[in-house]
Design a protein with these regions (language model features):
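A hydrophobic, multi-pass inner-membrane permease signature
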Residues: 1-288
Length: 288
């Protein structure tokens, strides 16, 4: 009786996981098929929509990089290459700022116990919605001539994601045995050398995980980029929202194609650090 009950519970658990996976995959599948549909298929009524494209085409991708669509006979002034470069530059630099500063601050708090109230203060900053302070930030950025610049957007990305990087890395540093660092200090290493040569290699996997999470946060941001950019440095989410014409309305096919392209950098980054990702997610889960 117990074996049968265990079997039913296990089967039910796997069915729930399967159902959740299918529900999660539906938008991805729909976006993928929409990206390869010709314009008449996604501009027609809802009763004519289908899962698979009847006449697959690359016209939506061509439209993004040329600004013209032969089948729709429309054109846009700005192609997708500029926003893609802007997103890549700003998200990368913002991640570099947040992870570098967050890692150094987390190590200092974890090991030297400086700023006892600093972790709680940083957590409170993270819980505070960034958009609530965007008006004074916009005034400050305008005064410093940082509106619609790569440096201005990268800097605010680094500031907003810094608390997240700090708390992740502080948790990981707390799980590193202090005895190893003390042994290195006894051998004559300076604290900076201990951090660089001993501690940092031990948290390489958690560091890779933090980089991935922070990059995804910066890469997918819409609200901050919408407020702090105008034309030259708009990002992919802002550009995607602007993909519409007076003749056709929303360019759903082009938006789906852009969504597929926008998913490539996080996926590539995840593949590059996949050997560290699982270890980083489970770092410190087991205690000796």
């Amino acid at each position: 009786m117990m074996n049968r009950r265990s079997f039913l519970l296990g089967a039910g658990r796997y069915l729930l996981i399967l159902l959740a996976s299918v529900i999660a995959l539906i938008p991805i599948v729909w976006m993928t098929t929409m990206a390869f549909k010709p314009a008449p298929e996604w501009t027609s009524g809802i009763e004519q929509l289908s899962w698979l494209p009847r006449e697959p085409t690359l016209d939506n991708f061509r439209f993004l990089f040329t600004g013209r669509s032969a089948k729709l006979l429309v054109a846009i002034d700005r192609i997708a290459l500029g926003p893609m470069i802007s997103s890549l530059v700003c998200a990368t630099l913002g991640t570099l700022i947040a992870v570098t500063v967050g890692t150094l601050a987390a190590y200092g708090v974890s090991r030297f116990r400086v700023g006892q109230n600093l972790p709680l203060s940083i957590l409170q900053l993270r819980l505070f919605p960034p958009l609530a302070v965007m008006i004074p930030v916009m005034i400050m950025w305008a005064y410093l001539h940082l509106i619609d610049t790569w440096w201005g957007l990268s800097l605010i990305y680094g500031i907003v994601t810094l608390p997240f990087a700090f708390w992740l890395m502080m948790t990981f540093f707390d799980d590193v045995p202090r005895e190893i660092e003390e042994a290195a200090l006894v051998e004559g290493c300076t604290p900076w050398r201990v951090f660089r040569r001993v501690t940092l290699p031990m948290v390489k996997a958690p560091l890779a995980t933090t980089i991935l999470f922070v990059f995804i946060l910066n890469w997918s941001d819409y609200a901050i980029a919408l407020l702090l950019t105008r034309k030259d440095w708009i990002t992919i989410p802002v550009y995607m929202n602007a993909l519409s014409t007076a003749m056709t309305g929303q360019m759903y096919g082009a938006k789906a194609a852009l969504g597929l392209i926008a998913a490539i950098p996080p996926i590539v980054l995840g593949i590059l650090i996949q050997k560290h990702l699982v270890r980083g997610l489970t770092f410190g889960a087991l205690k000796q």
